[in-house]
Amino acid sequence: MNEKTKELPACPVETTLTLIGDKWKVLILRDLMPGTKRFGELKKSIGTVSQKVLTAQLRDMEANGLVHREVYAEVPPRVEYSLTELGQSLKPILDAMWNWGEDYKNSVTGN
């Protein structure tokens, strides 16, 4: 058993929330689902997240195997982020959140 496995909660729902339970992580997943993005593109698409917070969230997601970070030896340096296979496996969860959010908005607005 590795160190990460020992730290995971017994409840699978809690485990999932441990990995993606932050507002920014869910939005990062949403914005990387279509494909690779550079840091600036991610920051712009997410909106109000600070550079410091986005960097910390991406590092955490990379450490947990959800995001791949590719650094290119160019001037200026180019860094791209993409979802790993594990990150892509969260698509049905994000799709369900999208559908639930649409249903909720429609029920509240009467549409």
Enumerate the predicted regions with their spans.
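Amphipathic alpha-helical dimerization/coiled-coil segments
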Residues: 30, 88-111
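Basic, amphipathic "hinge/linker" alpha-helix immediately C-terminal to the N-terminal HTH DNA-binding motif
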Residues: 73-97
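Short beta-strand His + acidic residue motifs that chelate non-heme Fe in jelly-roll/DSBH
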Residues: 70
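Residues within the DNA-recognition helix of helix-turn-helix
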Residues: 57
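N-terminal helix-turn-helix DNA-binding core of bacterial DNA-binding proteins
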Residues: 7-53, 77-80
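HhH-family (HhH-GPD) DNA N-glycosylase catalytic core used in base-excision repair
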Residues: 1-8, 105-111
